[in-house]
C-alpha cells in the first residue's frame, strides 16, 4: 500500500472553529492508526484598518480601528489512501480555509 506525506494547513478568523477541524483530523488519524504531527499553531496575523469616524472631514480627528485576526494551524500526516479519502470527506465550516499538499 502506498504511503504519502500530507501537510494540511488550516486558516480562519475564529480559532475555536479552526481547532474543531484540527480535532476531527486528529480523530481520523488515530482511528486509522497513522502517525500525525501537530497541530502546530503558526503566528496569528492581525489586520488593522483605521477609519475616520466623521464622514465630512469637519471637527476633530477621531478614528475607529477595525481589526481582523487570522489564525493558522499546520498538521503533518503520514497517510495512506484510505486515510486521505476520509480526510477529504470532513465537512469544512464556512470561514475556514484548508490546503492539503501531498508528497509521495
From Swiss-Prot:
Pfam families: Ribosomal_S10
Ranges in coiled-coil conformation: none
One example GO MF annotation: tRNA binding
Function statement: Involved in the binding of tRNA to the ribosomes.
Name this polypeptide is given: Small ribosomal subunit protein uS10
Taxonomic lineage from the root: Archaea, Methanobacteriati, Thermoplasmatota, Thermoplasmata, Thermoplasmatales
HAMAP family, alphabetized: Ribosomal_uS10 (MF_00508)
One Gene Ontology biological process: translation
One Gene Ontology cellular component annotation held by this UniProt entry: small ribosomal subunit
SUPFAM superfamilies: Ribosomal protein S10
Keywords for this protein: Ribonucleoprotein, Ribosomal protein
Organism of this sequence: Thermoplasma volcanium (strain ATCC 51530 / DSM 4299 / JCM 9571 / NBRC 15438 / GSS1)
Gene behind the chain: rps10
Subunit structure: Part of the 30S ribosomal subunit.
Entry's family note: Belongs to the universal ribosomal protein uS10 family.
Amino acid at each position: 500500500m502506498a504511503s504519502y506525506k500530507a501537510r494540511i494547513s488550516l486558516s480562519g478568523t475564529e480559532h475555536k472553529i479552526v481547532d474543531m477541524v484540527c480535532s476531527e483530523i486528529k480523530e481520523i488519524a488515530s482511528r486509522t492508526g497513522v502517525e500525525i504531527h501537530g497541530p502546530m499553531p503558526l503566528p496569528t496575523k492581525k489586520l488593522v484598518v483605521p477609519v475616520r469616524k466623521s464622514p465630512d472631514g469637519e471637527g476633530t480627528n477621531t478614528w475607529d480601528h477595525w481589526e481582523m485576526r487570522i489564525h493558522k494551524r499546520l498538521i503533518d500526516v503520514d497517510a495512506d489512501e484510505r486515510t486521505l479519502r476520509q480526510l477529504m470527506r470532513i465537512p469544512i465550516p464556512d470561514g475556514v480555509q484548508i490546503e492539503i499538499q501531498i508528497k509521495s
